[in-house]
Design a protein with these regions (language model features):
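Gly/Pro/Ser/Thr-rich low-complexity, intrinsically disordered segments predominantly at protein N-termini
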Residues: 1-214
Length: 214
């Protein structure tokens, strides 16, 4: 029997990474109307979980971490000779589950050949292979359960200090020490990358390449 990893506690973080508005009792139809009414180019991100709508406005710490994690992933994909389709914060809607999300980043890596060169149809295509969420402040959405229901194989969460890696096993997320997508890369490399990138982002990428090529 696989036991799901507990939801990490994000309330203890002193930094303010996001502003959030939570609305309860929102129907799926109302959620879609709100999506349609909002401009395509916006900083806010929506997550809908069966009646609960959370609107997140990322602040600097959030965006900084999210962008650097994306640089980290793309560098690893290139170094390992993999392929990638980046979905960014594309709206991922599953009407049958009454769930929708705009994660910080989502990627097709293992399944990139299935979706390359076209728009993804979530009604027929598999979910992204890897989803990344930066949650520095408390979120009312149980993200682990949420993305496990969407059957996302791998889920990364970063709270501004701690990076957690979850792998889907028997329908629930289990916390693991190494990424199934990048098994050769220890957690320490991301922490070192983020710390170095605070001073210089290009140098952080160069250091990652040097480490890989040793």
């Amino acid at each position: 029997m696989v036991i799901a990893a507990p939801e990490p506690n994000t309330e203890v973080q002193p930094a303010i990474g996001e502003q959030r508005v939570v609305i309860h009792g929102v129907s799926w139809e109302a959620y879609l109307q709100i999506l349609d009414a909002l401009p395509q180019s916006r900083s806010s991100r929506l997550t809908y979980d069966d009646g609960v709508l959370e609107i997140t406005m990322p602040l600097e710490d959030h965006e900084f971490s999210g962008r650097l994690i994306e640089c980290f992933i793309r560098a690893l994909v290139e170094l390992m000779g993999l392929r990638i389709k980046t979905m960014g914060s594309t709206t991922i809607n599953y009407p049958q589950l009454k769930k929708g999300a705009e994660p910080d980043n989502a990627y097709y890596i293992q399944n990139q050949p299935l979706v390359k060169g076209r728009n993804v149809d979530f009604a027929h295509d598999p979910p992204p292979d890897l989803v990344v969420e930066v949650d520095i402040t408390h979120t009312d959405i149980q993200k682990n359960r949420f993305y496990a229901t969407l059957k996302v194989p791998e889920f990364w969460r970063f709270n501004g200090k701690v990076w957690r890696i979850y792998q889907l096993q028997d329908g629930v997320y289990v916390e693991v020490e190494a990424s199934p997508t990048f098994p050769q890369v220890p957690k320490e490399r991301l922490y070192a990358f983020l710390e170095q990138a605070k001073e210089d982002e290009i140098e952080a990428v160069q250091s990652l390449r040097t480490w890989w090529q040793k």
